Regions:
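Charged helix-capping and loop-helix junction motifs
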Residues: 66-73, 147-156, 181-189
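C-terminal helical cap(s) of enzyme catalytic domains, especially alpha/beta-barrels
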Residues: 118-125, 130, 215-224, 228-251
Length: 251
């Protein structure tokens, strides 16, 4: 189980049909292919200094069952840094299968909303290895690959699911994701007010200015996708910026 005292910059690798892609606002039709070789992409991020990777099985998220596990296993065997994985994890069997591959932690999204008791049991069975993904739109929790909204507000759901003792909460504003329009600072601040669980930010991070703004919040890290692939953000620069701001906080 990976632990870090520093704020992590986590490159995202979204898998669909065996390729590394990015979706705009989670829409299937708005897909951009960034690599036909996700294993090579994972090695690239490791070589550039990534300490952790965020893998998402988009096919699994849409279909409710992981579809790219052979590829995930291949990635894990070819790199040395830890990875987290999400997408289609709706059963205890699926979670165990993924963890047995060597994934550091798994991300539970839709099923956490549908079955909070199951999440409590899961966190107890695999302490420190269960992350909760909260996908939000206008302050409301989104589920089923971002295709539906539920009745939970982000803050109410976070307060409730925190009782299960997840290792981390990953917050994504889906209206921002893939848009390169900046992160949801206000939503993150609201979330941080109601939970003590470490929070990782995702969605809309488009520039070093965004990285700097997030680095001043009390978060554990940030997941960056499209901006790394397009070159809007250099991984080394983002890591350096977080290190500088962390030093300033302690002075």
């Amino acid at each position: 189980m990976f632990r870090s005292d520093k704020m992590l910059i986590i490159p995202a690798i979204d898998l669909r049909d065996g390729k590394c892609v990015r979706l705009t606002q989670g829409q299937k039709e708005a897909e951009t292919i960034f690599s036909h070789d996700p294993v090579d992409m994972a090695k690239t991020w490791q070589d550039q200094g990534a300490d952790y990777l965020h893998l998402v099985d988009l096919d699994g998220a849409f279909e409710g069952v992981p579809k790219n596990l052979a590829l995930v296993e291949k990635i894990i065997t070819r790199i040395k840094i830890p990875v987290e994985f999400g997408g289609g994890l709706r059963t205890s069997h699926a979670v165990k299968a993924v963890l047995d591959l060597g994934v550091d932690r798994v991300i539970i999204g839709t099923k956490a909303v549908d079955s909070p008791v199951w999440v409590h049991d899961l966190c107890a069975a695999f302490p420190g290895r269960i992350a909760i993904g909260i996908d939000a739109k206008n302050g409301t929790v989104a589920v089923k690959g971002w295709t539906a909204l539920c009745e939970w507000t982000v803050e109410d759901f976070a307060s409730e699911i925190e009782k299960a003792s997840p290792s981390v909460i990953i917050y994504t504003d889906i209206s921002k994701d893939g848009m390169l329009q900046g992160p949801d600072i206000q939503g993150l601040q609201g979330l941080l007010r109601v939970v003590k669980t470490p929070v990782i930010a995702s969605g809309g991070i488009s520039s070093l200015k965004d990285v700097e703004a997030l680095s001043r919040l009390n978060i554990a890290g940030m997941i960056i996708g499209k901006a790394l692939y397009t070159g809007h953000i250099k991984l080394s620069k983002a890591k350096q910026l977080c290190t500088i701001n962390a030093t300033e906080k302690t002075e």
